[in-house]
Amino acid sequence: MSDEEHTFETADAGSSATYPMQCSALRKNGFVVIKSRPCKIVDMSTSKTGKHGHAKVHLVAIDIFTGKKLEDLSPSTHNMEVPVVKRNEYQLLDIDDGFLSLMNMDGDTKDDVKAPEGELGDSLQTAFDEGKDLMVTIISAMGEEAAISFKEAARTD
């Protein structure tokens, strides 16, 4: 055994931020990429095969980061990109300069997530100012991250 210390950099092994899926296999409440944005499908309908061509799938989806509504119409046999979406919970340490200071279960800190805007941001700030121990849910897809919800951490008394 050697006494040398080894440090290993973590990497994503070159994995893609999306994967292909046939239109007909997409489902409501699933995720899809429309206009290069990761979206959650809120409504979908299929039109019958016409005289020329394939059955079409009409998708209505909401951008998971901006909340904007996007629509797409595509043949059911075509492939669409589906984003790899991850949800992680972090303990909130601080809110500083519009950014959240977070800690994961391993004790690693993360300071690059923007504080949410609007009602969620206001209620998060209020709960934090009241001294509550908070867990924040962060959703990440296609290189973007955002806080989508928070809850009071369970007490371990």
UniProtKB/Swiss-Prot annotation:
Changing residue 83 to S/L: Temperature-sensitive growth phenotype. Lethal. The keyword Membrane does not apply. Pfam families: eIF-5a, IF5A-like_N. Gene3D superfamilies: 2.30.30.30, Nucleic acid-binding proteins (2.40.50.140). Changing residue 66 to I: Temperature-sensitive growth phenotype. Lethal. One of its GO terms (biological process) is translational frameshifting. Induction: Expressed in aerobic conditions. Changing residue 140 to F: Temperature-sensitive growth phenotype. Lethal. GO terms for molecular function: ribosome binding; RNA binding; translation elongation factor activity; translation initiation factor activity. One of its GO terms (cellular component) is cytosol. The modification Phosphothreonine is found at residues 7, 10. The modification Hypusine is found at residue 51. Lys-51 undergoes hypusination, a unique post-translational modification that consists in the addition of a butylamino group from spermidine to lysine side chain, leading to the formation of the unusual amino acid hypusine. eIF-5As are the only known proteins to undergo this modification, which is essential for their function. There are two genes for eIF-5A in yeast. This is Eukaryotic translation initiation factor 5A-1. It comes from Saccharomyces cerevisiae (strain ATCC 204508 / S288c) (Baker's yeast). The lineage of its organism: Eukaryota, Fungi, Dikarya, Ascomycota, Saccharomycotina.
